[in-house]
């Protein structure tokens, strides 16, 4: 009996030891998994908040300054902030949200200009409203990620400035590509006194693009810098 007990105990020791090691590994791994899950959840909450801000601004007076001759958008500000504090992927999603609000306005008649283009080329309009905005947010995030290694303060300013500039450049490039040859845009170009696509872009954007660039640079850099500091605490 004693011999059987000794053998059984001897055989059981490796099993108990293995179970103990597995338990220790599981216990050690759990905090890492938990931290990753918490980090992912925090990222999603922040991203959802930025997208919500874009939608609230888009469908309220906060998102646009409309005058008889100008429609100035401030939606590049939350796109820039999202791209800077959350990265290029989040920037692309925020840009996509911006484009989606523009598409909704076009489909519901909220923008006379977009509604007119929708009748001419629906695919061209949706491409013009969505793709440039997605690229704008993504590229803004990449610019900040690259420049912060050199000068973080400078990165905030340049990335914030790049967002409205990219928005204007990419949007107008797409607009010219799909619609410059149409009678509707040709009439606008004639009213501006030009038949050259480049001059049309400059004259069409004009003071509107300059105001958007200044506002987004000031607000985007200030807000993103403040949020970055606050999120570290």
Description of each model-found segment:
Residues 1-13:
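Short, small-residue-biased leader/transition segments that mark boundaries at the very start
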Residues 17-233:
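Loop-helix junctions at membrane interfaces
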């Amino acid at each position: 009996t004693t011999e059987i007990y000794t053998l059984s105990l001897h055989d059981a020791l490796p099993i108990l030891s293995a179970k103990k090691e597995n338990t220790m590994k599981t216990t050690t791994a759990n905090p890492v998994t938990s931290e990753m899950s918490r980090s992912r959840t925090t990222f999603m909450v922040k991203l959802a908040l930025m997208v919500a801000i874009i939608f609230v601004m888009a469908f309220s007076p906060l998102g646009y300054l409309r005058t008889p001759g100008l429609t100035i958008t401030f939606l590049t500000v939350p796109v820039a902030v999202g791209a800077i504090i959350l990265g290029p992927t989040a920037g692309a999603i925020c840009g996509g949200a911006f484009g989606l609000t523009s598409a909704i306005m076009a489909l519901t008649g909220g923008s006379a200009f977009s509604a007119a283009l929708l009748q001419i080329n629906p695919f061209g309009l949706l491409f013009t409203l969505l793709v440039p905005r997605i690229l704008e947010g993504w590229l803004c995030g990449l610019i900040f990620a690259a420049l912060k290694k050199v000068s973080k303060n400078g990165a905030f300013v340049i990335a914030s400035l790049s967002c409205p500039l990219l928005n204007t450049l990419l949007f107008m490039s797409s607009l010219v590509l799909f619609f410059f040859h149409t009678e509707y845009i040709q009439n606008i170009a004639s009213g501006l006194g030009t038949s050259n696509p480049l001059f049309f872009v400059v004259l069409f954007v004009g003071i509107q693009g300059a105001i958007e660039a200044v506002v987004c640079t000031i607000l985007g850099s200030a807000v993103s810098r403040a949020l970055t500091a606050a999120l570290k605490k």
